[in-house]
């Protein structure tokens, strides 16, 4: 899948949360609406996954926060889905739910797409046959979450298989493990 990352800064108006509550415009609250909007861009049936991942904002408990930062990423099966989400993000960050707030955002270029090609299917069939000739099961086809470095090679038009390494689970979490016997 293609991978794209984004960063946003939401600007509000600081004020004392007791004495001047109505003068403030809460940037964190506006960011919460943005998080919900980012999540709404998911299309799980197509395989598009949006992840609002990091939120930073506020300075003290008795002040309405005037700034909030939001980091997010997305994984996409096709460039058409990348474009759909880009349009949705432009609309989302171009509007405000809380009057007096505004947002700016940047996106990285979508990278690393690994779309299924005839050449890739041919390579997988070859690997399956070699595997079976040596008494191992066929590798088969599994669709994973995306953002693989294999996508860089695929972008050059070279057929490639992804995730043919050591077996394990829970990548990039504190539960991640690898099975030594699969090495």
Name what the model sees in each region.
Residues 3-183:
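Metal-dependent amide/peptide-bond hydrolase catalytic core
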